[in-house]
Every structure is written in C-alpha cells, then in structure tokens.
C-alpha cells in the first residue's frame, strides 16, 4: 500500500513524517511516497495535498498532469486530505481573489472558500478546536489560513472557529484550514489513515 503526499510545493516533509509515525503507531506496513510528477497518484491508496501557495500549487498540478489524476482518484473513492492551501485546491468554488488569479480548483469537495479568511489580519496563531471526529480538543496551527464560507448538503462540518468552517468532510475527502502536521498530535493523520485502510 502507498500513501502519496503531493510534493511539488508546500509543507511536504512534515506530512510524510506524521504519516510514517501514524502508520508505525497503527502497526501498518505501508510506503509514504512524494508525488512530484504524473503517474504516481494512480498507485496510491490515499493522497495528501499539503499547504503552500494555492495559486502556484494549482498551476503546477495542472502543468504536471497531476490534477486530472487526483480528480479521477477522488471519483474512485480514494481518500484525500487537503490542508491549508490544499483546502482551497480541492474546493468547488473560491472567492474573488481566487477567481482573479485564475486558479483551476479541483472541485472535488462541494465548498466555497475564502482564501485569506484568517490571513491578512493575523499571519499565524494557534487555537484549541473542538473537532467532531475527535474526543478532545485539537490544537490547530493556522498560518495565513483559508476558511470554508459555505458548503453543499453532502459536506459534514467537523469544526468551526469564529464562525468560519475550518474542518469538513465529504465522503472520502477531508479538508482542514490548519496544519495538523505541525503538531505532535497524530489523531487527524490516524483518522485519515483509518479512511485509507477501510476504503
């Protein structure tokens, strides 16, 4: 089994490390691979789209032919986790800023996002979050973070902060406005791993 982390831009090594630690804790044998070009996504049982700069990420995913592969994987039910910029990339609709930059979003989650929901006013901060899938609060690390403004009926809201949706799930797709890979708390990566193992 392979779990792939999109590695063309963004916080890659932290996700790779968190996934490897989560696998070890679960006692599961699997390979965590970095996806830098076309052809790797179809081999993966789970895909992580990390943070970074969403405009650049969208452009590189399209240019490298990875965007279409992710859409196909999502349609087949492969679990996908998008964090921070990844939350923007997987959305169906962006705000005016996203539209202005001409970002081609993957549209695999029925959400409308605000690219700089927590960004301009406070560049980075931590907040204790109540997350529906966890039994105790999770420390969310927010770095110029986006947020989900609205979502379709098939999307389950998992957490809110200041009225903004910061975690959501739609079937096999999980979106987070924060960076779980920047904490020592592996519960969200373990939850994602369970989705991979059960799909």
Curated annotation (Swiss-Prot):
L-glutamine binds at residues 52-54, 115, 143-144. Gene3D superfamilies: 3.40.50.880. One of its GO terms (biological process) is pyridoxal phosphate biosynthetic process. InterPro entries: Class_I_gatase-like, PdxT/SNO, PdxT/SNO_CS. The active site is at 84 (nucleophile), 179 (charge relay system), 181 (charge relay system). Pathway: Cofactor biosynthesis; pyridoxal 5'-phosphate biosynthesis. Its EC number is 4.3.3.6, 3.5.1.2. PROSITE patterns: PDXT_SNO_1, PDXT_SNO_2. It catalyses: aldehydo-D-ribose 5-phosphate + D-glyceraldehyde 3-phosphate + L-glutamine = pyridoxal 5'-phosphate + L-glutamate + phosphate + 3 H2O + H(+); L-glutamine + H2O = L-glutamate + NH4(+). Keywords: Glutamine amidotransferase, Hydrolase, Lyase, Pyridoxal phosphate. GO terms for molecular function: glutaminase activity; pyridoxal 5'-phosphate synthase (glutamine hydrolysing) activity. GO terms for cellular component: cytosol; glutaminase complex. It holds the Pfam family SNO. Belongs to the glutaminase PdxT/SNO family. In the presence of PdxS, forms a dodecamer of heterodimers. Only shows activity in the heterodimer. Catalyzes the hydrolysis of glutamine to glutamate and ammonia as part of the biosynthesis of pyridoxal 5'-phosphate. The resulting ammonia molecule is channeled to the active site of PdxS. This is Pyridoxal 5'-phosphate synthase subunit PdxT.
């Amino acid at each position: 089994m392979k779990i792939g982390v999109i590695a063309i831009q963004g916080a890659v090594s932290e996700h790779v490390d968190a996934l490897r630690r989560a696998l070890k804790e679960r006692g599961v044998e699997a390979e965590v691979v970095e996806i830098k070009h076309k052809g790797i996504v179809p081999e993966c049982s789970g895909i992580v789209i990390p943070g970074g700069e969403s405009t650049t990420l969208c452009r590189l995913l399209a240019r490298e032919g990875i965007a279409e592969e992710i859409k196909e994987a999502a349609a087949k039910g492969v679990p996908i986790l998008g964090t921070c910029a990844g939350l923007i990339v997987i959305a169906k609709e962006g705000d005016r800023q996203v539209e202005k930059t001409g970002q081609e979003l993957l549209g695999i989650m029925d959400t409308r996002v605000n690219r700089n929901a927590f960004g301009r006013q406070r560049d980075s901060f931590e907040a204790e979050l109540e997350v529906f899938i966890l039994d105790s609060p999770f420390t969310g690390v927010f770095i110029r973070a986006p947020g989900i403004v609205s979502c379709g009926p098939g999307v389950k809201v998992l957490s809110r902060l200041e009225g903004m949706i910061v975690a959501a799930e739609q079937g096999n797709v999980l979106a987070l406005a924060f960076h779980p890979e920047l904490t020592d708390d592996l519960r969200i990566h373990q939850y994602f791993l369970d989705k991979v193992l059960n799909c």
